[in-house]
């Protein structure tokens, strides 16, 4: 990585192996590969591949259909869940689910297997950029927990927190923290 990228309007952000711990554990499928393009800090294209199950989610894939919400499933880190997910689940009468990689968690929301993904343990741009690109293209909400937008290609690549969720749940989820 070079800070020369800060002078570019278009920057590729790649995570060749998201979910290293899960990749190392035999039988786990919750690891991913991320590729995203940002333009002026905004993710405009992205793909999240989950090779172990032979699936790739792309920002140009319009197959995503969001089902009626029957229960609120809040997905969080398998190894570093933090209290935020439980707080949201309690406030929205939901239940907690845990998975490994950020890509696998975000794609669970994209595919309708969860409604909310919250992360408070800190990540880096490469952990969330492609999942956010796919989520936004799928009609989901993606932001920081204070509701501010996620801006990429920053000099400090640390992203302290993240919320990806169904749009109709965004206000309720954000209200828990604001």
PLM features: residue spans?
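DPxDG-like acidic metal-binding loop motif
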Residues: 6-61
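Exposed boundary/loop context
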Residues: 2, 12, 34, 47, ...
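Residue-level preference for alpha-helix termini and adjacent loops
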Residues: 2, 16, 22, 30, ...
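N-terminal subdomain of lithium-sensitive/metallo-dependent phosphomonoesterases centered on the IMPase/IPPase/PAP
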Residues: 1-17, 87-90, 141, 168-169
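An extended, acidic
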Residues: 69-178
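Short linear motifs in intrinsically disordered/low-complexity regions
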Residues: 2, 61-62, 162
């Amino acid at each position: 990585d070079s800070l020369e990228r800060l002078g570019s309007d278009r920057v590729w952000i790649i995570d060749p192996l998201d979910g290293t711990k899960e990749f190392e554990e035999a039988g786990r499928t919750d690891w991913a590969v991320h590729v995203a393009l940002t333009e002026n800090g905004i993710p405009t294209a992205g793909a999240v591949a989950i090779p172990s199950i032979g699936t790739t989610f792309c920002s140009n894939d319009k197959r995503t259909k969001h089902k009626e919400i029957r229960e609120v499933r809040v997905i969080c880190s398998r190894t570093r869940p933090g209290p935020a997910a439980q707080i949201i689940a309690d406030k929205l009468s939901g239940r907690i689910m845990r998975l490994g990689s950020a890509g696998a968690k975000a794609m669970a929301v994209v595919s309708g297997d969860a409604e909310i993904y919250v992360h408070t343990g800190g990540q880096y741009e490469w952990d969330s950029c492609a999942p956010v690109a796919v989520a936004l293209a799928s009609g989901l909400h993606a932001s920081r927990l204070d509701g501010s937008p996620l801006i990429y290609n920053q000099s400090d690549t640390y992203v302290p927190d993240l919320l990806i969720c169904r749009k109709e749940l965004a206000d309720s989820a954000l209200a828990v923290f604001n």
